[in-house]
Amino acid sequence: GLVFAEQLLGLSEEVKHLEDEIDMLEIERERLKVWGRFDPEEINRLKEAGILIKLFRCHKRELSKIPRKFSTNIISEDGSTLYLAIVSKEKDFSIPLEEMEIPIAGMDEIESMIKKKGVHLQHKQNEISNLYDKSSVIKQALMESRDMLGYEEAKAGMGREEEIAYL
């Protein structure tokens, strides 16, 4: 019975951890939506080949801050906010706009991770369900443990002197 309870606690912690991971991945997926589907590894390969790509977010009226020597690609827009990829053959460059971090993983990889973790979460939730079906065993073990504890407490409180026993 206690083994079931320990399993249940362990599974509950795993479920909570998986739910948190899925939540974080879903937030990352939402953050990446504006950039569309691309492989961040491709950006790294281009960098190794001497082509630097940086991602920026800016207001439409800030486009004039970008020097003409750079190739500017508008990836998407959300109202007056633009999401840009700026391409250069310079080793490094700085533009007075809000630079966005290149993601570690692309949308496809994030969605695949969400799916895998979702399947794993469902499996753990099924295990919890199966343990709940065995809850009568856990309750029985709990009652037996309480009875045993009561007996041990009574036994520990007993004393004896010669032929007289007392509590």
How would you name each of these model-derived features?
Residues 1-167:
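Long, charged N-terminal accessory/stalk domains
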